[in-house]
Curated annotation (Swiss-Prot):
The keyword Nucleotide-binding appears for this protein: no
GO biological process annotation, one example: translation
Name listed for the protein in its UniProt record: Small ribosomal subunit protein bS18
SUPFAM superfamilies, per the entry: Ribosomal protein S18 (SSF46911)
Keywords (A to Z) from UniProt: Ribonucleoprotein, Ribosomal protein, RNA-binding, rRNA-binding
Organism: Corynebacterium glutamicum (strain ATCC 13032 / DSM 20300 / JCM 1318 / BCRC 11384 / CCUG 27702 / LMG 3730 / NBRC 12168 / NCIMB 10025 / NRRL B-2784 / 534)
Domain of life: Bacteria
One Pfam family of this chain: Ribosomal_S18
GO CC annotation terms, alphabetical: cytosolic small ribosomal subunit
Gene coding for it: rpsR
């Protein structure tokens, strides 16, 4: 029984690696609502804004992305929903 728990713990530790920050990798410092291709990385197939846990962004970057997505939706650059 102990080996089983240890194996499970080892497997969890191996899978929990920090995600790469896509904005930092692309060299983007300020998120712009007009940059639709970048914003689409942070939207799910149901057009919901993805969480930090999924995207690997910092809290400040996540707020900037959320604001940019909302502005792009208001400007009709991104859809609110999918059909």
């Amino acid at each position: 029984m102990k080996q089983r728990n240890n194996a499970k713990r080892v497997r969890l530790e191996q899978t929990r690696r920090p995600k790469k920050n896509p904005l930092k990798a692309a060299g983007i410092e300020k998120v712009d609502y007009k940059d639709i291709n970048t914003l689409r990385q942070f939207i799910s197939d149901r057009h919901k804004i993805r969480s930090r846990r999924v995207t690997g962004l910092t809290p400040q970057q996540q707020r900037e992305v959320a604001t940019a997505v909302k502005n792009a939706r208001e400007m009709a650059l991104l859809p609110f929903t999918s059909r």
